[in-house]
């Protein structure tokens, strides 16, 4: 059974995918997500925080992700880009969620929505990004 937070991440990823492709306003995407299957079982507060936070901070999040990539962020598939934006937002703004949980959730999103091996790429990028955004937490985990 999926947790309410996982459902909120799934819906946020779907909404951000739509936003990346269409450029629709966040409020319009939000309204569409409220009618989506699984919305009733999602953590609405977390969904709103991710969706609107990523749209608001997309340039800064993309700038944080860019040095961890092997190609320009614009060349990523929209699914991988949406997943990475969700994870970057959580790494940056939700320090209550352990970085390993953020990475694992992103890998699961990439497996669900992305291409065959996209999850491996997402995992590698987020490993680098978490080392930059969560220095103390990642260093402590690596010493164990």
Curated annotation (Swiss-Prot):
One of its GO terms (molecular function) is RNA binding. Signal peptide: none annotated. Keywords: RNA-binding, Transcription, Transcription antitermination, Transcription regulation. Belongs to the NusB family. The gene is nusB. This is Transcription antitermination protein NusB. GO terms for cellular component: cytosol. InterPro entries: NusB-like_sf (IPR035926), NusB_fam (IPR011605), NusB_RsmB_TIM44 (IPR006027). One of its GO terms (biological process) is transcription antitermination. Pfam families: NusB (PF01029).
